[in-house]
């Protein structure tokens, strides 16, 4: 892969670059086969390298009274492939529910995005749903700058390349770029990259519900403060059996357990032996969230960054959470954030919703 241009890549100047609020952009094209491959404009908006930001989170999580591990450990390139298998598994109802809702409502949802807007997708993933939305915007003759924000460079590049095949830069009204970084990085980038045009943030796949209701409110507050509006897709299913089937099957097990080798890779040691851990899922009724855990198969002593952490057989480390919030709960979360649900599109059973959120 040839990097054809880049704004300063000098690591030493990184802190001064960040302090001037300039984010690195790189433009590259793949020419291995000599074919005309489109360039990818990728902005590295990370304020810290991934290992630098995640290792302290792993340590803090092991030190905390209720042990937890950063959910971001799940989202490396391999994690995204494993998540694709989750999306394809017949028991994973949120994927089919969101697809059919988007299919039915995509034209109406797209009316909330105007020509000239900047559309930023948080946690863009495989961008299959994105393609549906961008096709609709194109059919509505809108010119849109689309930015896919996600955390793994190689997965982001691969998925952008696939999307670019559908929307070639030369002939399409839709211009595609990438933002490499977390949601927080993206919020910081937005603050220093104000645009004259309106910004719409799209958060699909129930991803906002990976945070507690309080954290979700804080994210909304932060994004709305940049003057953006938000399109948020959320699962409101309350059927416990269906949730357990969907989140506790073999595909989910593999997806969650992949966090352990990723932790080892970032720590540079084999602190977590995957054979020592099992996966379990549970419903947390206080938070209206499903929670996934690593469970110690035997008594363990883990050495991480020079400290030893003891686990008795059966003790857990919490991994990812997935909230199941019906409309009333979503409205409450938005209100807490100083926002308001301006419009919403629900499936017939009212178990899945897409919400348009703006400042109150
Ligand atoms: C549940 S998947 C949803 C993917 C896609 N939007 C969809 O609807 O199929 C969550 C996506 O968010 C990304 N992600 C998770 N945590 C993130 C964070 N803190 N900042 C940025 N992206 C994140 C993951 O890499 C993944 O692509």
Per-range role (PLM):
Residues 2-73:
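N-terminal auxiliary segments of SAM/dcSAM-dependent transferases
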Residues 127-131:
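Glycine-rich SAM-binding Motif I of class I
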Residues 209-226:
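A short, conserved alpha-helix within the catalytic core of class I
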């Amino acid at each position: 892969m040839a990097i054809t241009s880049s704004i300063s890549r000098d690591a030493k100047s990184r802190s001064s670059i960040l302090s001037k609020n300039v984010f690195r952009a790189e433009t590259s094209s793949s020419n291995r086969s000599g074919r005309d491959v489109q360039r990818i404009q990728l902005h590295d908006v990370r304020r810290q390298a991934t290992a630098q930001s995640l290792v302290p989170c792993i340590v803090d999580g092991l030190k905390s009274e209720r042990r937890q591990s950063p959910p971001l450990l799940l989202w490396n390139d391999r994690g995204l492939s494993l998540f694709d298998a989750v999306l394809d598994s017949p028991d994973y109802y949120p994927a089919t529910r969101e697809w059919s809702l988007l299919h039915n409502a995509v034209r109406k949802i797209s009316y909330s995005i105007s020509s000239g807007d900047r559309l930023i997708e948080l946690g863009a993933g495989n961008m299959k749903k994105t393609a549906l939305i961008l096709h609709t915007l194109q059919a509505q003759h809108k010119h849109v700058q689309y930015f896919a924000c996600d955390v793994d460079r190689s997965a982001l590049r691969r998925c952008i390349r696939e999307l670019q095949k559908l929307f070639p830069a030369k002939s399409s009204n839709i211009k595609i770029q990438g933002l490499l970084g977390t949601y927080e990085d993206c919020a910081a980038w937005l603050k220093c990259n104000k645009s004259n045009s309106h910004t719409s943030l799209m958060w699909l796949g129930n991803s906002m519900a990976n945070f507690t209701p309080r954290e979700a409110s804080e994210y909304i507050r932060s994004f709305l403060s940049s003057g953006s509006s938000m399109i948020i897709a959320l699962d409101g299913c309350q059927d416990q059996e269906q949730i357990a089937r969907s989140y506790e099957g073999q595909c989910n097990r593999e997806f969650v357990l992949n966090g352990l080798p990723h932790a080892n890779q970032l720590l540079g040691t084999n602190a977590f032996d995957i054979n020592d851990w099992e996966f379990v899922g549970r419903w947390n009724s206080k938070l209206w969230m499903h929670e996934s855990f690593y469970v110690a198969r035997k008594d363990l002593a883990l050495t991480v960054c020079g400290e030893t952490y003891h686990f008795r057989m059966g003790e857990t480390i919490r991994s990812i959470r997935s909230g199941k919030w019906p409309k009333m709960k979503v409205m409450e979360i938005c209100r807490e954030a100083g926002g308001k649900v301006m419009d919403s599109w629900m499936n017939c059973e009212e178990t899945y919703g897409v919400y348009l959120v703006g400042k109150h």
